Amino acid sequence: MKILVFNVRITRIEIHLSVLLLFSYLFYQGWILKLHTWQIITACLILLGSVLVHELAHVAAFSQLLGIRSQVLILAVGGAAIPLEKEPTCRGWRFAMVALAGPLANLLLAVLAVIVLVASQDQVTFNLALTSCLLNVVLGVLNLIPSRPFDGGHMFAMLLEELLGHPRLADFFARTIGSLCGCLLMLASYYLRDPFMGLGALASLWANSPLSSGRS
C-alpha cells in the first residue's frame, strides 16, 4: 500500500506503507533518548530525504553509466525497488559504480551538512545540520559494508568478478565475505541491543546464503 506518490523529473516516487515501521523505530529510539517529538519528526523527515537522494543517485547512475532508465522508484522499509526498462547486459566496474552512487551521495550530503554546521549561527540550524550529518554518515558507511544486500556487497561482487574473470568463483568469495559481515553485524546488534541492526544482519545472512537466488 502506497502512502505518498510524487514525481522527480521523469521518475515516479512511490513510498510504501512499511516505511512507517522505520519511523516507529526512530520514535522508539527518540523516546529512549528523551528527545522532543518535533526533534524525532525532523529526524524522520531528514532520513526520508536522505534515503530518497541515495536511491535517486542509483537511478541517475543507471541512466548515465548503463544507459538504462527507470520511471518508477518504490521506497519501502527494507530499501528501494527500481524497476528498469531493460535488464543490464554489462556488469563489472560500471555496475559497481552504480552501487557506489548511493553511498557516495549520502557522504556528499554529510560533507554539505558539516559546512552548514560550521557556518551556522543559531541552534536550530546547528541541530538540523548535525542530525543530517550523522544520518547521512550512517547511511553511507552502512551501505559500504561488503555484504549483499547492501550496496557495498553488490560493488564488492562486481569488482571481484571483474578482477577474477570467473563469475562463480567471484560469487563464492562475495558470499563468504558477505556472510562473515552478516555474523559481525549480528554480534554488534546483540551487544548494542539494536533490533534494526539485527534485521540488517539477517538480511545479509539470507542474501549471501546458498538458498538465496543467484547473483544480484
Q: What are the residue ranges of the model-derived segments?
A:
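Hydrophobic transmembrane alpha-helices and their immediate loop junctions
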Residues: 1-216
